[in-house]
Amino acid sequence: MKRFNIVLIILLSLTLSGLLFLRWKAREEPAVPVIAETAPPAPVPTAAPTPVPAPVFTPTPPPTPAPTLFTPPQGYTEESYNLVRDMVYAYADRQDDATEIIRDDLEQLNALDPALGVLWGKIMPLWSEVNRGLVIHDSILPDGLPEDESLCIVVLGFQLHPDGSMAEELRGRCETALRCAEKYPKALIAATGGGTAWQNPNATEAGVMAAWLTEHGVDASRILIEAESRTTADNAVFTSALLRERHPEVKSLAIVTSDYHMPLGVLLFQEEALLAEYETGTLPFSVVSNAALDTGGRVSPDTPMMQRSYLWSIADPKY
């Protein structure tokens, strides 16, 4: 019995020691968490895809043309305007080689509008004449011009120096005009040219020329000043308007400018007179002569293409 009790005590001691050891071990090594396997999600049933219809391509209609803003000059239809334009551009591009084109266009224009046919039947030969057969008088007007107030000597301006003083070429034109004014003492003198001195806005070519002429003995009452123009076409349009308004007695014009510039000057002043005749029924005046400053053979910048621009700007105010 005594032995049995001893054995029991030993067993209990061993059991208690084992439990204490396990508890101590649990504190040293934390338990590894057990991760339960997650079941995959159940598949979500999807509806069958809706079929997409094939795209239908509708052809794009052509754009609606913009309304035309074309308005021919007064007295012209679109057809007559195009005939005149064709003649002007043909001569500028080809000169004498355009003769057949000009003849055909004039025939059509005469059938379409006889008055316009007559007008351009005068302008187109004039253009050819000033480039091929114009007689240019050196330094002074010839004899035989009107000796009364019906003659006007038109002096074309030239670019001023920035300060408003005369360039040498403009002085030469004034000297030519002075000789002509002394030869024809009853003639009116029209000085034409606007402000071209960028450092002196008060100076104009016409004003400077008029001052020079009066300083050299020309009576100021003989001088008509046109001081608004910027181009030779402006010279022709503005001076002609002043002459018709203030000096209807003038019937003959004599142009004074540089030799190389004379064909353009004669062409534009005579064209303006012919256009006035077309509009009013009366020819106000004609270019009858000229006197040129000799520039020593300076080559003219007034090519037929340049002439076309000026001539067309007078014939078509929208140009």
Where are these regions (language model features)?
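N-terminal Sec-pathway targeting helices
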Residues: 1-13
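Extended hydrophobic/Leu-rich segments
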Residues: 7-9, 19, 35, 57, ...
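Hydrophobic alpha-helical membrane-insertion segments, chiefly the h-region
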Residues: 12-23
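A structural signal for short, hydrophobic/glycine-enriched beta-strand patches
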Residues: 23-26, 33, 65-314
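Ser/Thr-rich, Proline-interspersed low-complexity disordered segments
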Residues: 27-68
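The feature marks non-catalytic terminal segments
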Residues: 318-319
